[in-house]
């Protein structure tokens, strides 16, 4: 349901008449500015946005007319077609309507690189000092590859490898920081009948593989892979990628593929909780998803989360991060005031309000505002891990080919032993050629 909330919280400006020695007196009128903000309503609700808007008005005097809806595209599209745009839109890429992607393609989003140099309203820090490293250096915020920022990162959820921290404590095991250490731990665990790895479904390999690609070759390799560049699969980095995937398949619990479906995936998650496997890729939602199952456990259990290990000693570990985006339409009427609002979204006040609804902003030190397991999950980047962000570039539809069936689902066959790593690579090379030929934009 459409919700339009007019927030008129600024004090009414007093009109004063000042005598000027017999001249005609003109009242000095300072009209309060109003901006329009449109935000997608998700599980976080609409009240959190109303509270942030009110806090912004109290800080700056700029009023906010707020629109929230779970089908936001339907609500705002008609007025935008008539040339009336919200000043700020919170709407991520990846939604079925593809509205944000269309604005990106049309280059109809205002550049906000200068917002990073702005002081956060009500604070003495710059926006760039508040946002965690890497979040404004991805194609999700800098879509044109020109070093300029157009979309602001919002509400993130880190992904990583989840494990039973109590088991590691009991066994005296150390969480691996390199893949060599991971293989050694896998051998030690196998002696006790515990597999090194499992996964809920092969679809969970998306965030896992993204982080792995970053850890092998950084942003350059990631961009080459996700844009299907010619020759990328014949590089040393690609050889390393396939070698790790092949070896990890051998260390994966053999019951995993049979249960890697929408009906039985929780059985694979229980493998970690019941000490049948050490690690699984997942996101912070796992705690709530398995909360009831945790009450039935008979073993000692506590959640642990770590980034993917580095490829070499001294290298960086990576954790993939899902996040949303806010942006300013190029046709907005109040771009300067809109930029102030975007800057305010990273204030301590706004972050605290968002956090009450479980919406976690990508700012440094956010863990200090959180409680329970969230402290561990959201401090992963404070503890040395780097954030992996981005996804595969879009291409026009190709019959029988999509990223999931080409890159992720074959993992089930790798683990089951019905597909070799060479066959897997050959299929990826063939599909990538078609994807490259059909790239959009």
Where are each of the predicted segments found?
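Extracytoplasmic/periplasmic substrate-binding proteins
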Residues: 101-102, 211, 243-334
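C-terminal capping/gating helix-and-loop segments adjacent to ligand/active sites or protein-protein/ligand interfaces
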Residues: 227, 320, 358-365, 379-437
